[in-house]
Amino acid sequence: MCKKTLLTLTVLALASLTAFAASKDGIVLSKDGRMVTATKPTKSTVQAPSSDAGMVKIYDSIGTAYPKGTYWCCEGATIFGPTAISGEPEYWEAGAFTPTADHTVTKVEVAVGYVEGFNGLVIGLYSDASGVPGKAIKTWSVTNFPQFGSCCAVVAASDSTGISITANTQYWVVVKTGKKSSNTFAAWNVEDVDQVDSELTAFWCSDDKGGSCGSDNDVWVAGQAIPGHAFAVLGSN
């Protein structure tokens, strides 16, 4: 009976996933296309010592206390360019944070893995607009993301001048495609530091060049996620 139940659960779990029918072996999409799983993790390296010493951690869901497990290697939220996968819409992702004091942001770090296409994305710091990402405060075009399914490198975007943010005001870190990344397929890794409390995330979907977003076309949609996206916002007081 136990074996039969386990087999049934396994079949149901596999039924909720769909194999990625392209050149990347071991990459599986959820049925709705929103999540990516790496079933064959790639070679990982321990993250090099960070240059974040002395910086204020305004928000941090990257497990720096555990350099061999700063985030979960093998599952993440889908980021698609408009021509990345035939039959799939364009997807962007965002994670919210609220500073408890006034700060100056000088660095944003994200745990995002590259699957295929152009290895580059846009990272942005955004204001809030009624609970979803609003206007871009600052954006960075970033290339050379680590391979999805590996751990534990992160990608950083810096601003030497600094960006002022206000206490008790919600902001968003956005990872999206740009002009050069129309065929990019990537995934924002889920965090490993808190698997109890939910985090506010949002996705943006566009079916202008294919796929279907239903009633959510070309708008941000927010929701709670457990676990949330792995990212950090650093700076000074």
Residue ranges and their predicted role:
Residues M1-T5:
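Positively charged n-region of N-terminal signal peptides that target proteins for export
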Residues L9-S16:
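Bacterial N-terminal signal peptides
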Residues L17-A21:
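Sec/Tat signal peptide C-region and signal peptidase I cleavage site
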Residues A22-P82:
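Boundary/junction segments of secreted and surface-exposed precursor proteins
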Residues M55-T70, A167-Q170, V175-N237:
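Short, surface-exposed beta-strand/loop patches at domain edges
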Residues G87-A101, V155-D159:
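Short beta-strands within extracellular/lumenal beta-sheet-rich domains
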Residues T100-E109, F118:
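Extended extracellular/luminal ectodomain segments enriched in beta-structured repeat modules
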Residues Y114-T201, C205:
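Aromatic- and Gly/Pro-enriched, solvent-exposed loop/edge beta-strand patches characteristic
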